[in-house]
Amino acid sequence: TNEFIRFASSGIFEFYKDVAKVKCGADKLLASLKEQNIKLCLASATAMSEVKYALECHALSKYFDFVISCADIGIGKDRPDIYIKAKSLMGIPEGEICVFEDSYVALETAKKVGFQTVGIFDRYNFGQERLKKSSDIYLDENQTLDCLIAMIDNK
């Protein structure tokens, strides 16, 4: 029913506001990339209203040039459509795009169409061993995004 959907949605917004945390070093990494004028697109499987809410709650909107959702595309990340749309929006060849994912299904989809990939551990997603195996770079549970900042700053 609509009442249940409203109730469930309100719980999701509370989760993003009170429970969900920004991954360690993510804000520094985004700031570093933005300072270097690197285009950033957030391509999420989450509904756009929830994505925008989460970005605002954590003051991350300012880093992204584009934000797209699978709901807008009409298909999940098991198909490359959202990545192809992101590439089109950014105007960059796939070989120059790096996709960050915590889902092995999404990461493998991006990799199949030629994107570089960074797998990021997420305790809420199963298949971490497969994610690690499929990633060009993998950041484990105890690693932070700070190591990527150092790699980018040294280029």
Regions from the PLM with identified roles:
Residues 3-13, 65-67:
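Short, basic/glycine-rich phosphate-binding loops at helix/coil junctions
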Residues 1-5, 23, 27, 61, ...:
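Short, structured helix-loop boundary elements
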Residues 10, 14-42, 48, 52:
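Short, acidic loop-to-helix structural element flanking the phosphoryl-transfer center
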Residues 31-34, 47-48, 52-155:
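Asp-based, Mg2+/Mn2+-dependent phosphohydrolase catalytic module
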Residues 2, 6, 20-23, 45, ...:
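Non-catalytic, surface-exposed connector residues within folded enzymatic/regulatory domains
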